[in-house]
Amino acid sequence: MELGGAAGALGPSGPLLVCLCFGTLAAQAADTCPEVKLVGLEGSDKLSILRGCPGLPGAPGLKGETGAAGLKGERGLPGVPGKAGPAGPKGSTGAQGEKGARGEKGESGQLHSCATGPRTCTELLTRGHFLSGWHTIYLPDCRPLTVLCDMDTDGGGWTVFQRRKDGSVDFFRTWTAYKQGFGSQLGEFWLGNDNIHALTAQGTSELRVDLMDFEGNHRFAKYQSFRMADEAEKYKLVLGAFVEGNAGDSLTDHGNHFFSTKDRDNDESPSNCAAQFQGAWWYHSCHSSNLNGRYLRGPHTSYANGINWKSWGRYNYSYKVSEMKLRLT
């Protein structure tokens, strides 16, 4: 049957029904059907389709032209520093700079100090240094030497070259140690044979020995002159007459004798007096005094190896304090 005849046979509603039939067939051929809403069939005979089925995707269009470059972004944060690279080649020396301004005048050098500085503790005393203590003096060869000056005893001006006071320093030492000197400014010391020789070579010096026992008793011995020869003469003791002192004379017997240590035997005894009596001294055979002996703290049963002074205490008493000092006359 032709569609036109069929629509005419259905009367005034025929065209609408034909369209609905075709819509139904199309919806069955697809998975989904459009949502249809009939509006005004009785009045206006109109049909409104609110949503139809989606069509098949179209072919992709042509690629568009590249757009213009965007604006440059802001600078980012700095990254983590990398490892240091190898050192570059050394550059060439630059041009010489201009001469600088003249500096301030420096302090006087040693030669000037030697020419004008004090030579002895006696000279320091005459310059107004009245306090006992450590001072710098200058030897004849311009060497500076720090010494302990006793400005209190017997008029002052004494240079102390030996001090024993507490046993803190071992005096049983070698020839080299006595040559150079040893000990502490705060305690016990030996100034050194070379230094003692240099001090006594400046002129005539007197000698004083001060002793104190462990009961607090003080005694002394004083000699008219004192000189120590140089190492070539084995530091021989050249001693003047005993002048005074309540300690008595226990050093005259050692005059004109050589200095001996445990490793350098220059005495007149078949044995080594320094090794036997554990000291270092101008031994003959062997001694009347041994002020560089062992620190034995008063009475001792051992024989003659302490800080002994025969004329006071004999050979079995070791003194608490011993000081040997010289003064240029």
Curated annotation (Swiss-Prot):
Principal location class: secreted
Disulfide cysteine pairs (residue numbers): 114-142, 121-149, 273-286
Cellular component terms (Gene Ontology): collagen trimer; collagen-containing extracellular matrix; extracellular space
Keyword Repeat on entry: yes
Domain Fibrinogen C-terminal residue range list: 112-329
Classification via InterPro entries: Collagen, Fibrinogen-like_C, Fibrinogen_a/b/g_C_1, Fibrinogen_a/b/g_C_dom, Fibrinogen_C-term_domain, Fibrinogen_CS
Subcellular localization, as worded in the UniProt entry: Secreted
Gene3D superfamilies: Gamma Fibrinogen, chain A, domain 1 (3.90.215.10)
Glycosylation sites per record: 316
Biased composition (Low complexity): 77-90
Boundaries of every Collagen-like domain copy: 52-111
CDD domains in the record: FReD
Disordered as annotated region, ranges: 64-113
Function in brief: May function in innate immunity through activation of the lectin complement pathway. Calcium-dependent and GlcNAc-binding lectin.
Protein name from the UniProt record: Ficolin-2
Lineage: Eukaryota, Metazoa, Chordata, Craniata, Vertebrata
Gene: FCN2
